Amino acid sequence: MATAEPSGRALRLSTPGPRPSGARDRAPGAAGPPSGQIGNRALRLGERTPAAVEKRGPYMVTRAPSIQAKLQKHRDLAKAVLRRKGMLGASPNRPDSSGKRSVKFNKGYTALSQSPDENLVSLDSDSDGELGSRYSSGYSSAEQVNQDVSRQLLQDGYHLDEIPDDEDLDLIPPKPMASSTCSCCWCCLGDSSSCTLQ
């Protein structure tokens, strides 16, 4: 199926491989797939999605397959690879997996018993009261660190908890406004009554 371009070269539109039997019976200028050939048959593994061919004037134009067709082809290839590796679906040679499975452990490992009475983690503590007071909330590690830091500061002589935090923290006392010039800027030329701080 070739048409001549104005430059004299032939444009080949057929895909490599055997031609369908219905393609021999069609006219050379007919566009589209043979009736009932590609629409009903499933693509084989590695086969390209057929491009839509339409005739525009004297030229045959092929359109690229849609993105949905490309995505479906990619999904089919991925499923085929997973099936081949035995990770997807039930193969005909696999035994029925609906029964109870037996678990095999690697050498050197023992199975944990699943009884609810046993704890997976045991805490070394003398009493349960100590455990409750020490870990009182979800932020237990932060509380413990805070207690340790405050205890260390009290031992070193810093009494941070005894000084209230509501005092002004200005270490440099403000200057008295006794001078005739404005201390914030030089715009008011000495008239401090008209100057306002913003």
Swiss-Prot record:
Keyword terms, alphabetized: Phosphoprotein
Biased composition, class Polar residues, residue ranges: 134-146
Protein encoded by which gene: FAM219B
Location of Phosphoserine modifications: S14, S91, S125, S127
Family: Belongs to the FAM219 family.
One Pfam family, short name: FAM219A
InterPro entries in the record: FAM219 (IPR029339)
Protein name: Protein FAM219B
Native organism: Homo sapiens (Human)
Annotated spans, Disordered: 1-58, 83-146
The organism's place on the tree of life at top rank: Eukaryota
